[in-house]
Amino acid sequence: MSSAPEKQQPPHGGGGGGGGGGGAAMDPASSGPSKAKKTNAGIRRPEKPPYSYIALIVMAIQSSPTKRLTLSEIYQFLQSRFPFFRGSYQGWKNSVRHNLSLNECFIKLPKGLGRPGKGHYWTIDPASEFMFEEGSFRRRPRGFRRKCQALKPMYSMMNGLGFNHLPDTYGFQGSAGGLSCPPNSLALEGGLGMMNGHLPGNVDGMALPSHSVPHLPSNGGHSYMGGCGGAAAGEYPHHDSSVPASPLLPTGAGGVMEPHAVYSGSAAAWPPSASAALNSGASYIKQQPLSPCNPAANPLSGSLSTHSLEQPYLHQNSHNAPAELQGIPRYHSQSPSMCDRKEFVFSFNAMASSSMHSAGGGSYYHQQVTYQDIKPCVM
């Protein structure tokens, strides 16, 4: 009876000894990783360079004589230059590939025919090189995109209408001396009333309204300055040279301008801006020409003697009327909004040229030669 328990004891003791041996064997194994962790924790990883990955890639590409590198060459440059990229951490390679592929300032060059597979060359976009001049490695200047978006509409309008050629020294303060216009005299279909906010500071006297009429009347004559009250004919002196005829000027029923009496006086008594405005006023007092067969719908026929043709700056000798006046009916078939919009642009450019070509004591004229043969485009 006692031998049975004695036989069972050795396996139990052996098992216990085995277990104890197993526990002794696990102690150094468990202590090994802990010591390794402690040793790794004591060694600090090199500090990351104080540059963005875009800046690091640009440094690598600019260091090459050919200004282009492959991905592996960029890796080699970074590892040789900065100790941070020589350690066991390999996540920076993903960041380099990410910035190369997603940033528009880097371009992947196409490979040759005999080089299949990987190994594309990377270079800097020539349009983005200015962002990295003088050590500036930011993507773009702060607020650069917002400023471009804010200034783009104004620049496009200024360049389209030629307002950038009007310096502030050419004042038009006296241009509204004899013309008093109601606020709604500029009947515009679009948003041309916004031009009042972008004109130079001295163009306030032109009496451009800050708002526009959304729809043009479909019947009847309408004009930009149809409601302007012209001054008396005797208030304006006669200019020495006659104004060149233009298809933008209103004419009589026959299509030819009638000569008027010569008024005595000197053009030197008027300031340059006022005299230039008198010449250009002929283009501004442009009423929409209607068909000659419908004189009742055209209020211009009854008001020419009181508004525009009585004024001496519209004086025209009969021998100076060119043949282009016969081309006026070509404007009749156009839509009212298209004709008025085109003629407004032409009139403003003509006024700008007249103010810049004005002489001190001579006559003042505006060049209409450029616009005489231009037909308004029908959109």
Swiss-Prot record:
Region feature (Disordered): 1-45
GO function terms (MF aspect): DNA binding; DNA-binding transcription activator activity, RNA polymerase II-specific; DNA-binding transcription factor activity, RNA polymerase II-specific; RNA polymerase II cis-regulatory region sequence-specific DNA binding; RNA polymerase II transcription regulatory region sequence-specific DNA binding; sequence-specific DNA binding
A UniProt-annotated Pfam family: Forkhead
Chief place of localization: nucleus
SMART domains: FH (SM00339)
Gly residues biased stretches: 12-24
Keywords: Activator, Disease variant, DNA-binding, Nucleus, Transcription, Transcription regulation
Gene3D superfamilies: Winged helix-like DNA-binding domain superfamily/Winged helix DNA-binding domain
PANTHER family reported for this sequence: FORKHEAD BOX PROTEIN BINIOU, FORKHEAD BOX PROTEIN F1
The protein, known as: Forkhead box protein F1
